[in-house]
Amino acid sequence: MKQHSQKLLSLLLCLAMVLSVFAGMGAPAAAADVTAEDVSQGKASSSFEPWGHGYRMVDILNFDPATDPYSQELVASVPLQERNATFAATQANKDLSDDSKLYVISSGNYRSTDVNEAPWNAGMSYDDFSYNLFKFWQYADMVGAGGRPTQNIAIGSADKEYGIIAVPMAAATNAAHKNGVITLAEYFIPRTPQYTEEWLYQAEDGSFPYAQKLVDLAKYYGFDGYFINQEASIDSSYVPLFREMLKYMREQGVYIQWYDSATESGGVSYQNAFNSNNSGWIWNETQGHVAHSIFLNYWYSSTALKNSKQHAIDLGLDPYEVVFMGVEGGQWEFGTDIETRYNAVDENGKPYTSFAIWGSDWYHEQFHKPNGRYEVGYQWEAEERERIYYTSATENAGEYSTGTVKRDDISYDDTINFQGFSKYVVEKSVINGASFASDFNNGHGMQYYRNGRVSRDMEWTNLNLQDILPTWQWWVQSADENRLELDWDYGPKFFRYVNGEEDHFNYTQIGAYNGGSSLAMHGALAGSQTVNLYKTKLDVTADSSISLTYNKPSADDTSKAQIALIFEEDPTQTVYLPIENSGKKTEGWTTATVSLGAYAGKTIAAIALELSATELVENYQLNLGRLVVSDGQSHTPAAPTGLKLVNRFDGTNEIQLAWDLGDYDTVKNYHVYAVYADGTERFVGGAYAANYYIQTLENAESVTALRVRAVGVDGSESAAAELPLASTCRVSNVRTLSENNMLNVTWTDPAESFAKVEATLTYWYSETTNENQTITVNQGDQKASFPIELEDGAQYIVTLTTVNADGTKNETVSYFSDLTDKYCAPYDGEGRVNPSGRINLTTPAVDDWNLAYVEVDGNTTTYRRFGGSSMANLSVKKDGLTLMVITLEDMDGNKSQPVTLMFLNGQPATAD
C-alpha cells in the first residue's frame, strides 16, 4: 500500500560510503605495536546492569530479539495463573460483587522513570531496599508500565526522549502472573518527534507491519497487551485503519485498552463518558469488537457514569469488563473520595463501572522529592500509604470512613477522605490445588534470611521472590476495643523517620524466617482476635497437614494461638486447630504442625490465626515466618540442568548465569547461592527465569562456586546444580582504548603457567556493520588490537580466555563497553504524502541522532529530536521535481552523509 523504495536508496548510499572509507582494512592481529602507554587512558569495564528502554515506533518495526538490548535478561517467564471463582462467604465485605475490576498503571515499575536519581530500571533485582514493590495484587486485574526513555539516552541527561511504547518490567509481569493479574505496556502519543500516521498503514497482504511487531514484542517479553493512550489527533481517514489494526492485535490474543481521547472523527475530545462519540473504538457495527475496554477521562459526573454503564449494556457489552473510570492517583491522593465527591456508586453502594488508576505509584513516588523517597527511613511511610489506599484509612478491611482519619506522621497533612479500593473491588486469590507455601516475604529486605539466619547481609529488592502475600492487609477482627497492629518486620537494620526525626518501632525487630520480611502482630491482647490471612481453595486429603513457623519474642503469658480454617462445605463454621504452648516465649523460630486428615475431602476456603488471652497481655508480639499447607506428598523438583557461566565481568564482579527453565507446574522459582572457600553458603538472588544477572557478590574474592536450586510448589528446594568459579589462571585488570579505527585491549596475565590467551570481540545486541573477531596471543603479550571498520559507538563484549599447552581452556573473563563514536548513520526513512497533500518524513531508525537538517530548494530547516517538532507537513512542489536533502547529526556532533529524496509532482519518486 505504501512505497518503501527510498529505504533501498538510503542503504546503498550508506554502503557505498562505508566501502570507500574502509576498503583494504586488515584482519585482526596481535598488538605487538601497542604499549602500556597507549592504553594508559583506557577505561575499565562498564556495568552490565540490565535496564529497560522505551521504543520509538520505528524501533518496533525493526524489533528483533537478536538486536534488542537485554532481550534475554528482561523476559518474563511465569505463565498467567487462573484465579479462583469468587466465594462471597470469606470476603471481608460479603455483599460486595466481583463485577468491578481494577487497572493500576505505573505499578509495573520499581521506581519512577521521571527523575535523575532513579535508574530506568527493568532488571530482575537490585542491591537496594528502597524500591517500590506493589503488594496488593488481590485487588488488581491489570497492571501497567510508566514511560521509559529510548535506547542510548544517558541516565540523568536533560535530553530525554520517551518511547511511544513502554514495556512492564519482567519482574512485575512475573509477580503479576503469579497472582492472576495481566500486565499491559503503555502506548502514548504525542511523543515528539514521533507521530501516529507514520505507523498506520496496512501491507498488501492485509497485515499490519507495526501491529504485528507489537504482537511479537508482547509475546516475546511475556506481557499481555497494551494501553493505547492516543492523545494526538489524527485525520478522520485514518480512524477505520487504526481500528482494524487494534482488531488485528486483539485477534492474536493481545489485550487492548483504549483511552478516552480520540473520537469518531479522529480528533482528541475527552468525553469523560462512554458514549456514541467513542464507543466505536470498542465495538461498532462495521468492525465488531475492536479494543477490549476504555479508560474514561477524569472529569465525569455521576450521571455520566450511570449513562456510560447503560450505553455499554445497550451495545450488548458488560460495563464492568468494558468501562473503567479514570482515577488520577497523583492528583487526588487521599483528598478525593470517589463515592462522596463523584457519586460513582449507585444507591446500593455498587460502582457503576470498573476503575483505572493513573499514577498508581504516587504513594511512593510523590513524597520526599528528590531523594528521600529512595531512603530506607521513609519506606515505612510509603507502605502505610499504599495500605491505606488499597485497604482503608484504618488499614483494616471492611472498616471504612471518610474525613475522620488524619495521618501527618506519613507526610500527609490533610484528612484522609479516600475510603480504599477494598470497599469497591473484591479480593481475589490464586491459591488452589492441594499444596501452598508462603514465607511472608514481600520482595525486599535489609538482609536475606534463610531458616531464620542471615544468609545475605545486604539490602535487596526482587519482586520475583515475592510470595503470594496475605489476601488482606490487614483484616483483624477483635471481640473488644483492643486490636493488634500488624507490620512487615524487616529486622534490626530497618529504621524509620517520623516528621524528619529517627523514630523507633513499637515491636521487637526480628526479621524474616526466609526472605526479607516476616509478619509481626503486636500490641495489647485480650479476649479473642482473629487475624485473617489467606483466601484459598485448597483440597484436603487424608495426608494433608498445615504448619506454621512462628517466633514469639514477648514474655510467657496466658495467650493462646489457634489456626482457624473455614471450609467451603460449611462457611458459617470456623474450625480451630490449637498450637500447643503458644503462650510461651520462643527462643527463635519454632514450627507447629497439625494434621488435617480428619477433614479429608473438604476444601479450605480461608486461613486465619486466632489469638486470645484470658487476661490483658500488654506488649504482646508474635511473628509469622512461614505457612505451609501440605498434601503429604513430595513436591521437591529435580536439580536444575544446563547451568553455565555466560559472563563474569572483570573489575565490576558482575556475573551472568543461565540454565534450562523447568515447567512452572513443578518449579515455582530458582534460588542462586554463592559458595565460599570456608565451605559456607550465602544467598545471592533468584527468579523464575532461564538466566540471572548478579549485581554484587558479598566477599567476591572468596567465592569458589555458585549453586542454583529449583523451588517447588511446597517451598522445598531441590538438590543444587553447581558451577565452580576459578580463582586462578584468569586474566585481570582489563582495559580498552578505542581510537583510530582500532580497539586496543590490555590485561594482566595470571601468575600460573599457560600457553596463550584467546581474545574475542563480540558486538552486543548490535546492528553494526562490524564483524565479530578472535585473536590468539602468547602468554606475556598481555595486549591485542582489533581493527574496527566503523567507529559507531556500538556496545561490545571482549572475552579473554587462557588456553593451556594441551589446548584445554580455563575460565573466561568478560569486559563490557562501547566504541568511540565518530560516525553518524545517514537518514534511512522515507517521505509519505499525508491527507493534506504535504509530506511526512518517517522517524530515522538510527538510535543516535540529535538534529536533522532538511534542505528543500536551498532552504534548510533544522529539526530537533529532543523537545523539537516532528518532521511532518513539509511542502513540496505540486508541479515538477523537488529534491529534499536530509543530513543527520548525532549526539556527539558527527554528521551523516546527505541523503536525497525525490518528489515528482508532489509524490515520492525514484531515480528510475
Which residues does each predicted region cover?
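Sec-dependent signal peptide cleavage junction
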Residues: L19-E37
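N-terminal module-boundary/linker segments of secreted carbohydrate-active enzymes
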Residues: A32-W137, Y255
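Chitinase-like catalytic core of GlcNAc-active glycosidases
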Residues: K94-N307
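Extra-cytoplasmic beta-strand recognition segments
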Residues: D487, Q529-A561, A592-V594, L627, ...
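Short carbohydrate-recognition loop motifs
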Residues: E501-T530
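Conserved aromatic anchor
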Residues: T652-D665, N741-E752, G837-V846
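Beta-strand-rich modules
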Residues: Y693-S718, I788-T808, K878-N894
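Extracellular fibronectin type III
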Residues: D714-T728, A805-T820, G893-G906
